């Protein structure tokens, strides 16, 4: 499965979080994506894959031979999306070979153009995935999840040497609780990167 198909699959699974909830995760729907990722991580070949009672998803890539003493790196992304716009039926729209014109968002009457979003100018000729205008897309942060999952798949399939890698997908980041119950002893990384950016090339 390529990164685009992964993202499209994840985007259609509704995972809105709920402000003011007293439990974690704040919505049970986040478990739907968590268990989907759990299954895929096992299929890819990650080890010690786990979804805990608070909807934190863990998985690990052991170091390849000769790289056991490298620093232990972690990658984190979040399962939830904002829940204050539109319905739960998220319908991604794929625009191939972008030509620079305004992109109509389905039949919603909304559109994206380079005046509002100047970085679209850097996407000429590329494939762009948008919402249909009736919901959020959820690229924050399902794009990050797709990137991390594809990285893991590529490292395993292409037998690319690497040190030990920890993966964690967290719930409730959009309401400020993403790292609240992350088990640092289990995650056990020397350094970690949160994959949750904006424009291409941003660090």
Regions from the PLM with identified roles:
Residues 1-127:
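Acidic/His- and Gly-rich active-site-bordering loop/insert found
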């Amino acid at each position: 499965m390529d990164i685009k198909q992964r993202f499209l699959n994840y985007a259609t699974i509704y995972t809105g979080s709920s402000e003011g909830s007293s439990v974690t995760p704040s919505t049970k729907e986040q478990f739907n994506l968590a268990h989907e990722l759990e299954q895929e991580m096992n299929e890819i070949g990650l080890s010690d894959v786990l979804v805990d009672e608070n909807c934190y998803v863990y998985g690990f890539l052991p170091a390849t031979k000769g790289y056991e003493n490298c620093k232990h790196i972690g990658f984190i992304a979040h399962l939830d999306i904002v829940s204050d716009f539109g319905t739960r039926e998220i319908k991604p729209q794929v625009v191939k070979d972008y030509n620079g014109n305004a992109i109509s968002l389905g039949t919603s009457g909304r559109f994206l153009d380079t005046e509002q979003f100047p970085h679209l100018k850097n996407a000429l000729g590329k494939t762009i995935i948008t919402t249909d205008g009736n919901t959020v897309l959820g690229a924050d942060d399902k794009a990050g999840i797709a990137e991390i999952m594809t990285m893991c798949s590529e490292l395993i399939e292409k037998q690319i040497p690497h040190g030990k890698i920890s993966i964690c997908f967290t719930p409730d980041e959009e309401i400020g609780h993403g790292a609240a119950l992350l088990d640092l002893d289990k995650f056990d990384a020397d350094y970690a990167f949160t994959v949750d950016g904006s424009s291409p090339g941003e660090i």
